[in-house]
Amino acid sequence: MKKQLFILSQYLLPHHLLSRLAGCIAECRVRWFKNAFTAWFAKRYQVDMSQALVEDLTAYEHFNAFFTRALKDGARPLDQTPGAVLSPADGAVSQLGPIEHGRVFQAKGHSFSVLELLGGDAALSAPFMGGDFATVYLSPKDYHRVHMPLAGTLREMVYIPGRIFSVNQTTAENVPELFARNERVACIFDTERGPMAVVLVGAMIVASIETVWAGLVTPPKRELKTFRYDEAARAPIHLEKGAELGRFKLGSTAIVLFGPDQVKWAEELVAGSPVQMGQGIAAPKA
């Protein structure tokens, strides 16, 4: 019964209003409040601050600064194996495997469309049909910056509006096409392994998604918006392997897509496997 009530609440709650309220709280600079809230959060979720560039919880100007904290140099060494594909984030593998019939596996009995995930653009989604995907879930305690799995040149970014369902095992198993319904930002890169998509998926109380080249992505009007970066008028944006791509102000999920016959996921990785940014999660297939 508790599970059914939780799922029902996901459909009834005012997602965007709650996220705006969470954003206001997370940006609050009232010293006693932000210190107390940050300390409670760190204790509640057992956040390891020993690897943070700034270990003192009270030194952050607001909760979001703590949540998107930088790590010390060397805290996340990059796998130096030639051709290695890196985990884009700290977290746990939600699912990974082949893209079959244009769909990505979500949980038992559920999948979602690559076409819908990328905003309904057939030309954008076509290179990934028959390819491979990995979904990484970032829990509240994790480092919340997202990094490049491979070096790449940005070709396109798409903001796709949507709901903001909570993202966890329960919703993955009970909300159809969860990741293709939530608000998200899809980033398409040209890499040594062909096109690569990194999709940052929002969730309830995720106040915003940022990228290093555009800052806050959420447009004033919540409508689908495409930003092209392969035009002559724009300077190319190239990011090296392991470079920061973006960040969640409060957490969620990163999904990585590759085209057919490009990568082979590490055999030891299964649903639930913990991963760290910079860890090798795949090798070139050919």
From Swiss-Prot:
One of its GO terms (biological process) is phosphatidylethanolamine biosynthetic process. Its main location: membrane. One of its GO terms (molecular function) is phosphatidylserine decarboxylase activity. It is an enzyme of class 4 (lyase). Keywords: Cell membrane, Decarboxylase, Lipid biosynthesis, Lipid metabolism, Lyase, Membrane, Phospholipid biosynthesis, Phospholipid metabolism, Pyruvate, Zymogen. GO terms for cellular component: plasma membrane. Catalyzes the formation of phosphatidylethanolamine (PtdEtn) from phosphatidylserine (PtdSer). Heterodimer of a large membrane-associated beta subunit and a small pyruvoyl-containing alpha subunit. This is Phosphatidylserine decarboxylase proenzyme. It comes from Pseudomonas fluorescens (strain SBW25).
